Amino acid sequence: MTATWSVNKKIFLQNAITVKNNQPLMAVVKNNAYHYDLEFAVTQFIHAGIDTFSTTSLREAIQIRQLAPDATIFLMNAVYEFDLVREHQIHMTLPSLTYYYNHKNDLAGIHVHLEFENLLHRSGFKDLNEIKEVLKDHHHNQNAKMIISGLWTHFGYADEFDVSDYNVERSQWMEIVEALLSEGYQFDLIHAQNSASFYREGQILLPHHTHARVGIALYGSRPYSSLNQHDIVQSLTVKAHVIQVREVQAGDYCGYSFAFEVTKNNTKLAVVDIGYGDGILRTRAKHEALINGKRYPIRALMMSHMFVEVDGNVHAQDEVILYNNDIRIDEYTFKGVGANSEQLSAMNHDSLKKEYISNDC
């Protein structure tokens, strides 16, 4: 028996179609499409009617170009391999005045999207004046030069409801967009909304925008907890099996470093063939596993095993579900286990058996 990571292809595709909601999306496929596999995800998103993609890796951007020759591909990180960017017709962020002036000549022929820093402060121009400085310098540049195709930002607080920061960053961004458009500047692509913002706005684009730049929702995880589970459906299942069921007594310690102290006689512990070496986070192991439709508490986590406290209804070879649509990634995000993407990224695709299922199993 080998622990398995599996995706239902039909559910994945249908979720992408539902998330898209007939709106133009830029699908975020960074980090190997959130570890769902870049080729698989891009292919499914194309079937869902998505033809625009973004990533943080030039290597991935080139791979997307090979998969989708006619797609628009946006690189969210600035890079310095300008010839490769040109060769593969990759759009790229323009992250700062310094980068622009240092590489103005290198950027000739490359499509760039002007980036507004906003509240995240990770990258981008500080304010409207910096953006206009680039636009004016670019206008007067008589040499071979870059092609300004886009305008973008990232909302870092769209999933925060207890503070006003999303409203602040949204307002600041819209002021930038409207000021530039009112002065006659035009952009082929304007994008800012992540999954949380897209859903907060009712799955429609903000005014003047051409795309929403959606990531985690396309992979079946809700960006915030008040969304109904039926709105975003998880296609991923991570499962293992019971190797054996052990009976232990009050006062026994089970697992390394006294991980679990037994408090009742004749306690049953299922030994399960999955552990942190397969990508189960220790924070996730503070919660439950699903066996035969019932949740049971995980009591100890080891590299290749875990102990789950069970009852007489659990037997050797029973399936143990760590994640599926009934025990979801996003549920444990909201319980503090870690971000949706953190839990997905932890999965060890070298030790887990990887499957793509074509039916409704």
From Swiss-Prot:
**Statement: the UniProt record of this protein carries the keyword Amino-acid biosynthesis:** no
Q: Pathway, per UniProt? A: Amino-acid biosynthesis; D-alanine biosynthesis; D-alanine from L-alanine: step 1/1
Q: Which Gene3D superfamilies match?
A: Alanine racemase, Lyase, Ornithine Decarboxylase, Chain A, domain 1
Question: Which cofactor names does the annotation list?
Answer: pyridoxal 5'-phosphate
Catalytic residues, per the record, are 30 (proton acceptor), 256 (proton acceptor)
Asked if the Swiss-Prot or TrEMBL record annotates the protein with the keyword Disulfide bond, the reply is no
Give the residues the record marks as binding substrate: 122, 303
**GO MF term list:** alanine racemase activity; pyridoxal phosphate binding
The record's keywords, sorted A to Z, are: Isomerase, Pyridoxal phosphate
In terms of superkingdom, the source organism counts as: Bacteria
Query: What GO terms fall under cellular component here?
Result: cytosol
Q: Which residues carry this modification: N6-(pyridoxal phosphate)lysine?
A: 30
Q: What is its EC number?
A: 5.1.1.1
What does the record give as the reaction this protein catalyses? L-alanine = D-alanine
Supply the Pfam families for this chain. Answer: Ala_racemase_C (PF00842), Ala_racemase_N (PF01168)
An example GO BP is: D-alanine biosynthetic process
HAMAP family in alphabetical order: Ala_racemase (MF_01201)
Q: Which family does it belong to?
A: Belongs to the alanine racemase family.
The function of this protein is: Catalyzes the interconversion of L-alanine and D-alanine. May also act on other amino acids.
> What name does this protein carry?
Alanine racemase 2
Task: State the taxonomy lineage.
Answer: Bacteria, Bacillati, Bacillota, Bacilli, Bacillales
